[in-house]
């Protein structure tokens, strides 16, 4: 599906080497002040270019087509496009008839019987620029509720952060949360890039200001929706909320978040219990695999099933988790915005405040 969300729905379209990518954000409430400078600043965080990312240079300027009037949202669908301008489609001519290892080439072809080989087409992470734009609109809405979402890179390869500093991450070229390992992480990225390889990463997203009681029960739990949002990002192979997998190795007496008159005494649950927020910061770790596009000869097969060698050209990120941290932030914004709108009808008192 190309649509995400329940009450707040984002539909995206476009391919990596098409004329443009874009989205329609439906269900966004009227009256939200739209800050286009903030929107572009968010796009610039994800924008390609630089020695730690792909050298493909795109302006990533968002052209708003509808849903905004005199600086405020109108309540109608917000339509927008982001034009592609720096495609090098010929770089992919040599692999148009074979399946790149680690990519969605084989699975897309198995499902649809056709695929756009130019930069991965629809499966390219280029599409995530649309999510970042939509997430920026979400942030403008969340600002009205004093909900703040921060993301950064927690680990690259085997280098893990021992401290969490979002202020530093906001200034870091690679959004690294720990200043003590940033230089080593940069060197690691350049080392794998220079050896025609890639490296994985993990990001940390923390959501502050979410009141207790946000989320749905059972099949639309808040943590389930957040996990689905993160797993829908290109290259993500795992998501943890709170302690995550560590909780399976400890005792209940160690995992439970006890309470006193001041509230919770710990936050192992990561801000969510029973699929509903408990008022504590929501903590999400998202794990990205190494970029599958590497410049090493790799065995694969072609459309006829013949064994061939894949020798890639083109421009690719040596570590997709870096820009992935920006996308993770955007997806969290969309989920929380959606859940706020859904929660408005969760009890009669909420409706009375609106209609009385």
UniProtKB/Swiss-Prot annotation:
Membership in a protein family: Belongs to the chorismate synthase family.
InterPro entries in alphabetical order: Chorismate_synth (IPR000453), Chorismate_synth_AroC_sf (IPR035904), Chorismate_synthase_CS (IPR020541)
Disulfide bond positions: none
EC category: lyase
Name of the protein in question: Chorismate synthase
PROSITE patterns according to UniProt: CHORISMATE_SYNTHASE_1, CHORISMATE_SYNTHASE_2
Gene: aroC
Origin superkingdom: Bacteria
């Amino acid at each position: 599906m190309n649509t995400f969300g329940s009450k707040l729905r984002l539909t995206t379209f476009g391919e990596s080497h098409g004329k443009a990518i874009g989205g329609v954000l439906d269900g966004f409430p009227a009256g939200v002040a739209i800050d286009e400078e903030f929107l572009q600043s968010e796009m610039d965080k994800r924008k390609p270019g630089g020695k730690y990312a792909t050298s493909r240079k795109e302006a990533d300027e968002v052209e708003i087509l509808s849903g905004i009037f005199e600086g405020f949202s109108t309540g109608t669908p917000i339509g927008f496009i982001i034009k592609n301008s720096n495609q090098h489609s010929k770089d992919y001519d040599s692999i148009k008839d074979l399946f790149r290892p680690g990519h969605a080439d084989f699975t897309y072809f198995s499902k649809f019987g056709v695929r756009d080989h130019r930069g991965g087409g629809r499966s390219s992470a280029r599409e995530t620029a649309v999510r970042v734009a939509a997430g920026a609109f979400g942030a403008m809405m969340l600002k009205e509720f004093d909900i703040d979402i921060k993301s950064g890179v927690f680990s690259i390869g085997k280098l893990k952060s021992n401290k969490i500093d979002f202020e530093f991450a906001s200034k870091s070229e690679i959004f690294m949360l720990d200043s003590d390992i940033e230089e080593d992480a940069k060197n690691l990225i350049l080392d794998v890039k220079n050896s025609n390889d890639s490296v994985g990463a993990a990001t940390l997203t923390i959501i502050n200001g979410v009141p207790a009681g946000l989320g749905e029960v059972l099949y639309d739990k808040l943590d389930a929706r957040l996990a689905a949002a993160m797993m829908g990002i290109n290259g993500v192979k795992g998501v943890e909320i709170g302690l995550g997998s560590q909780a399976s190795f400890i005792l209940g007496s160690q995992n439970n978040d006890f309470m006193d008159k001041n509230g919770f005494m710990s936050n192992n649950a990561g801000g969510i219990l029973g699929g509903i927020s408990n008022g504590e910061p929501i903590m999400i770790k998202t794990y990205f695999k190494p970029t599958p596009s590497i410049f090493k000869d790799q065995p694969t097969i072609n459309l006829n099933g013949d064994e061939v060698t894949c020798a890639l050209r083109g421009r690719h990120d040596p570590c997709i988790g870096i820009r992935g941290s920006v996308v993770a932030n955007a997806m969290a914004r969309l989920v929380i915005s959606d859940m706020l709108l859904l929660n408005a009808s969760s009890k009669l008192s909420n409706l009375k405040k609106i209609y009385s």
